[in-house]
Amino acid sequence: MDTNRPGAFVLSSAPLAALHNMAEMKTSLFPYALQGPAGFKAPALGGLGAQLPLGTPHGISDILGRPVGAAGGGLLGGLPRLNGLASSAGVYFGPAAAVARGYPKPLAELPGRPPIFWPGVVQGAPWRDPRLAGPAPAGGVLDKDGKKKHSRPTFSGQQIFALEKTFEQTKYLAGPERARLAYSLGMTESQVKVWFQNRRTKWRKRHAVEMASAKKKQDSDAEKLKVGGSDAEDDDEYNRPLDPNSDDEKITRLLKKHKPSNLALVSPCGGGAGDAL
């Protein structure tokens, strides 16, 4: 080893010598990478084309000289085509291959549920966006059971006021009256008819409750009058002079109805308070 060369002591070890050889090899392989931007000179296109052999189909001049269809076919020639992929998939996943390999029947041929198709494949991505939902069905709004859901109409305060005033005058409307009222209120005849039917049902229930309450009150008043009349008759008998020898039953009945404090003052024999004491 020449020890007079500068840096010879650095290359005395085997690993450092290997690194030095790799650096020299890199310099010889990539001369343009080590030069500055000013010293870099791009090789001419004709020179590169001349260096490549004439039979090579991947040269720059050959690629640029091809038509568009031929270039695309040459570039994509190595990629597998869809038809080939489908045919190969049919070989592995077809019904004949399944039977030959001993697998059971495909899902489409099995009895029971129909094959499942994912919405993302059949309908595409827009089905996920609720803003792109389709219009409502023409038959009206459907509930969760699939039946048609009837929406209840709402009336304004002016319409309800006019209907109530008309109902106070008459509980039933004839055909011309109903048509005239519906036209004046901006409603349909069926709406007016249904409103009067519901209003009559409500009125009958309220009227029945009021009649039952009035009858109950009347019966209570009659019972009070009856009880008050019997008390008045007893008071009249109590104020009358009684014969102690013949009116013992009346005296006993009157004593039972009055307060027990009067028992000490009146005796059945007609004696006074002094006799009782």
UniProtKB/Swiss-Prot annotation:
Predominant location: nucleus
Organism: Homo sapiens
Associated clinical condition: Spastic ataxia 8, autosomal recessive, with hypomyelinating leukodystrophy: An autosomal recessive neurodegenerative disorder characterized by early-onset hypotonia which progresses to a pyramidal syndrome with ataxia, spasticity, hyperreflexia, weakness and loss of ambulation. Brain imaging shows cerebellar atrophy and hypomyelinating leukodystrophy.
Gene Ontology, cellular component aspect: chromatin; nucleus
SMART domains: HOX (SM00389)
Expression across tissues: Highest expression in brain.
UniProt keyword Ribosomal protein, yes or no: no
Residue ranges, compositional bias (Basic and acidic residues): 216-226
Compartment(s) of residence: Nucleus
Region ranges (Disordered): 132-155, 210-250
Taxonomy, superkingdom: Eukaryota
Annotated spans, Repressor domain: 89-142
InterPro entries listed in its UniProt record: HD (IPR001356), HD_metazoa (IPR020479), Homeobox_CS (IPR017970), Homeobox_NK-like (IPR050394), Homeodomain-like_sf (IPR009057), HTH_motif (IPR000047)
DNA-binding positions: 148-207
Alphabetic keyword roster: Developmental protein, Disease variant, DNA-binding, Homeobox, Leukodystrophy, Neurodegeneration, Nucleus, Repressor
GO molecular function, one term: DNA-binding transcription factor activity, RNA polymerase II-specific
Biological processes per GO annotation: cell differentiation; central nervous system myelination; negative regulation of cell fate commitment; negative regulation of DNA-templated transcription; negative regulation of oligodendrocyte differentiation; neuromuscular process controlling balance; neuron fate commitment; pancreatic A cell differentiation
Name of the protein this chain belongs to: Homeobox protein Nkx-6.2
Matches recorded under PROSITE patterns: HOMEOBOX_1, HOMEOBOX_2
Described function: Transcription factor with repressor activity involved in the regulation of axon-glial interactions at myelin paranodes in oligodendrocytes. Binds to the consensus DNA sequence 5'-(A/T)TTAATGA-3'. In oligodendrocytes, binds to MBP and PLP1 promoter regions.
